[in-house]
Regions:
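C-terminal catalytic/acceptor-binding lobe
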Residues: 2-145
């Protein structure tokens, strides 16, 4: 496995979905662990994450996708570079800014409705992303040619 993405965890107030935040209100403190990877497709956060230059053309935080922006970007990157994500211990503490959890939930509905279809048909991701997201990603990728 050649790690091209190193996603480091964070202690404190995690970036989780609104349902979990509303029901659990977690504050986390991770115990020390060794870096790990998986051969499964996995989301990773855009925060506290290091990317090798070779993946930059294929990874972006996608606009017009609600709160799926970094999650769907991570899946698309892994379509092009499978088995390339390494997870590491927490190296930062996150104190989240105040948020409207109902608005967050509304912005997550696109994911509840479309993520499984995206994962099952990842090779066709350009036809599954919102039209404005595809327009953006095409422009973004031109800067790497």
């Amino acid at each position: 496995m050649t790690p091209l993405v190193q996603a480091e965890f964070w202690d404190g107030d995690p970036d989780i979905d609104a349902i979990c935040r509303l029901s659990k209100k977690p504050i986390v403190k991770f115990k020390h662990f060794e870096p790990f990877t998986t051969y499964q497709l996995t989301p990773f956060n855009s925060q506290n994450t290091f990317l090798h230059r070779s993946v930059l053309k294929y990874y972006s935080v996608f606009p017009y996708t609600g709160r799926m922006d970094d999650i769907w970007g991570a899946y698309v990157m892994q379509y092009h570079f499978p088995n390339s994500v390494l997870f590491n211990k927490a190296t930062v503490y996150q104190a989240r800014n105040p948020q409207d959890l109902v608005k967050n939930l509304e912005n997550e509905v696109i994911g509840y409705r479309n993520t499984l279809n995206l994962l099952n048909n990842l090779k066709d991701y350009m036809s599954l992303l919102p039209e404005k997201t595809v327009e953006y990603f095409n422009i973004y990728q031109k800067y790497f040619n």
